[in-house]
Amino acid sequence: MEAIIRTERIEKIYYQGRPEEVRALNQIDLEIPKNRLVLIRGPSGSGKTTLLNLISTIDRPTHGRIFLRGEDISRYSDVQLSRIRQKTIGLIFQSYNLLPRLPAWENVAFPLLPLGVMERERRGRSVEMLIQLRLEKRVDHPPEQMSGGEQQRVAIARALINDPEIVIADEPTSNIDAESIQILLDIFMDLKSKGKTIIVSSHDPVFLDCSETIFFLKDGRLVNIEQRESR
């Protein structure tokens, strides 16, 4: 299987102003296959979110290298990494990271601003995405007037607005209702059918049945890899 992301002995160390270091990740070697739904599991504090931050280029490893489509991006500048996030990676944060008073469509359109997309097109693309997520009645409503499940769907729409090749989601089903969870699963399956790669960090058992590659972390180490047949 072709790897879209590969890590080579990556480590993340935090010093936190104390003499002893905190090693959040330790010597992680993994390959994330293209066009797969990948699940990252492990107990709280095992390094799941830290790993997502590194492979999404939000943060940099203390040691080791990260490859995207075979190219070492470890020494890319911040500007280069920002361009990768804009064009290649869609991020779904556990905390949603929405602007609470802006209309839903403007939140969704936010990633289009640096690309110079005109307002009419931004709104059109955002509304289309919100309709796909069954939020057609919430287009002009701000997130502060929405339920947790609706806010998560707005965050998903924002992550997908640039048609990213890779979608990365951190605990995407936490604090949302059953309907929103099913919508999310349907979206992920649809994305995969279009050749996208989906990487999810979650404790939720709903992802176990649909995931094809499962990485298990413990105490900052990769302790198990499970490969399944493509679905």
Briefly describe each language-model feature range.
Residues 86, 141-144, 162, 194:
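Conserved signature/switch motifs of ABC ATPase nucleotide-binding domains
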Residues 167-170:
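Catalytic Walker B motif of ABC-type/P-loop ATPase nucleotide-binding domains
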Residues 64-72:
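Conserved ABC transporter NBD signature motif
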Residues 178-180:
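Helix N-cap at the start of a conserved alpha-helix in ABC-type nucleotide-binding domains
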Residues 56:
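Helix-to-loop junction immediately C-terminal to a conserved catalytic motif
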Residues 102-110:
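Short coil-to-helix segment of the ABC ATPase nucleotide-binding domain corresponding to the Q-loop/switch region
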Residues 142-146, 150-152:
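Conserved ABC ATPase signature
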